[in-house]
Curated annotation (Swiss-Prot):
It catalyses: guanosine(2445) in 23S rRNA + S-adenosyl-L-methionine = N(2)-methylguanosine(2445) in 23S rRNA + S-adenosyl-L-homocysteine + H(+); guanosine(2069) in 23S rRNA + S-adenosyl-L-methionine = N(2)-methylguanosine(2069) in 23S rRNA + S-adenosyl-L-homocysteine + H(+). Keywords: Cytoplasm, Methyltransferase, RNA-binding, rRNA processing, S-adenosyl-L-methionine, Transferase. It comes from the Bacteria. SMART domains: THUMP. InterPro entries: 23SrRNA_methyltr_KL (IPR017244), DNA_methylase_N6_adenine_CS (IPR002052), RlmKL-like_Mtase (IPR000241), RlmKL-like_Mtase_CS (IPR053943), RlmL_1st (IPR054170), SAM-dep_methyl-trfase (IPR019614), SAM-dependent_MTases_sf (IPR029063), THUMP_dom (IPR004114). The gene is rlmL. It comes from Actinobacillus pleuropneumoniae serotype 3 (strain JL03). Belongs to the methyltransferase superfamily. RlmKL family. PANTHER family: RIBOSOMAL RNA LARGE SUBUNIT METHYLTRANSFERASE K/L, RIBOSOMAL RNA LARGE SUBUNIT METHYLTRANSFERASE K_L. HAMAP family: 23SrRNA_methyltr_KL (MF_01858). It is found in: Cytoplasm. One of its GO terms (cellular component) is cytoplasm. This is Ribosomal RNA large subunit methyltransferase K/L. Pfam families: Methyltrans_SAM, RlmL_1st, THUMP, UPF0020. Residues 46-157 form the THUMP domain.
Amino acid sequence: MTTQITYFATAARGFEEMLKTELEQICQAECKVAQGGVHFTTTQRGAYQALLHSRLASRILLPLVTTKIFSDLDLYATIVGINWAEIFDPRDTFFVDFNGTNREIRNTQFGAMRVKDGVVDYFERKGFARPTVDKDHADIRIHVYLDRENMVVSLDLSGDALHMRGYREDTGKAPLRETLAAAIVLRSGWQKGTPLVDPMCGSGTLLIEAAQMQAGIAPQLHRKHWGFNAWKGHQQAVWKEVLEQAYLQQNEEIQPLFFGFDLDHRVLAKAKQNAKNAGVAHLIQWQQGDIAALKNPCPNQVGTVICNPPYGERLGTTPALIALYSVFGQRLKQQFSGWNASIFSGEPELLNCLRLRSHRQFKAKNGPLDCLQKNYQISERTAAEQQADELKFEQNAQVAPDFANRLAKNIKKIEKWAKQQGINAYRLYDADLPEYNLAVDRYDDHIVVQEYAAPKNIDEQKARQRLLDAVSATLYVTGVETNKLVLKVRQKQKGTNQYEKLANKGDYFYVTEYGAKLWVNLTDYLDTGLFLDHRLTRKMVGQMAKGKTFLNLFAYTGSATIHAALNGAKSTTTVDMSNTYLNWAEQNLELNNLPLRNNRLFQADCLQWLAECRERFELIFVDPPTFSNSKRMEDSWDVQRDHIKLMTQLKRILTTDGTIVFSNNKRGFKMDFEGLAELGLQAENISHKTLPLDFERNPQIHNCWIIRHIEN
């Protein structure tokens, strides 16, 4: 049993040095770090100890052959040449894990198949029964690693991966692997015998791993099936001694200094069961609670706060997370003075919302996500200092103060005006400060923060951090509930992709505008269903429509139609190519108790419908897109290039005393007055009259024209 053998322990990238230290402690092995793991030389007893006690290793492999191969024939020949009869009985099942490729073996499934063929053919040539492959519960796992022409064939002594401790029956959302959780604990700076608090513990993995460390419970103590059970080289007597020693080293006389909090009582129930399965239920105290009410369970001791808070892969989840991290940082400073904190997150920018300065940080992968763990020393402060800090936080939250002050100033000015106007949907901020390139809109009790795409010369990380800061400040200044703040990242739109669906929440509510009720949806589309900058245009159209036949072309959700109908239009006709938005317009009509018999809706290519129209209208509102190349349109559309073509068709259906209200959003649009004159039409630019107070900083957001027949 004193024979020294070199094994290989695999680990997640970045944890190799930690694993080396751990293996040296567990089995006094000679270790050499490699990419993705550690070569360690020890006895078979030492290998058993590593299997039982390692918290960081993913698998422990016993190399059988290390060689060079240049083709699948070389691979097959190598496998057939191994004396498998000395390794396992053909009556046992096996499975092949194949990792890596080269020029000849370009597919891991093909590589695994060739290995399987080699093993099966070996036994059949020796006159044995053909062994069976079992993907899920194999007795023997063969591991093959291929790097260019270098190949290592190993026996996987672990069986199932070692992160599968066996204590987790169920988990909450986004669970941590146990090996990663153990690494987070080891990197946190937590000292055994001191309190450990997880304020958002989820299924409890961090606390359970730490509690097992404290109690001396081997992570694999209760594992039933091992990859070496069917191995002919297995030494059962030695394994039994290693197992008995592990039971003896457990420490049952330790204080219960582990505390887990979570808002979700269902997840806490799972955490409690997991702790029971892991043998540490008596060491961990669980409590349901909101992070905003977090209190230090051991105020007279110094310990560590450890946490893997939620983080969103999609930006749309960010407002609530910004608020969560901001409040978390505040509670840490208020309740855990003098303590250490270690926070692990998949969105490093969110860690900045804690407003704490880290003294150490570590990178790690959680599945495909690049994550960051930051360690903090929470400075000790007197009660007076804490009170002063809380007051300072209350005053301006110390986040984006310039932005917060400008937003507060705008709110004071605009909300008074909005109340007088009888509107509850309006813009509060429109890129007033260059470093905060975004818009803030209010829709009743909801807020939309809409980021404009940053210029190419602006660092992406810096722009992202400013956005997070602005959202945090907006939450504070407006007092809006986090679930009523919507964040949109705006890119330059091409064609009709402004109508692409982003989500399917179906959260509609209505806003009011000069007596009209209009449905909006803040989450499912890039736009909300209501262009706020056209508010005065809609009001004007409504006033002009009284007693007239009205056409709304490129109607979007029909908001101008609502104003016209409410103001006494004789009839309205609404045309849009999008069935989604035409249905939206119908819902707007129903909301305002406007009957469909007087308010017709047509889903059609607007230009084609116009060419075929034989009716005449006294008032026409047309607000076409700047550019479109929709597959449902026969030709592309460019408002600068094609507006005279449009006017040619509109003149045909316009009554002699009729009016066209023409608007578009193209910056630098130039009206073709000569082309209009040839048609017998004249235009008046009224853009300045249709620009509301909340958009006065952006006079080029739209241009608007009154077009009539030239009087003889």
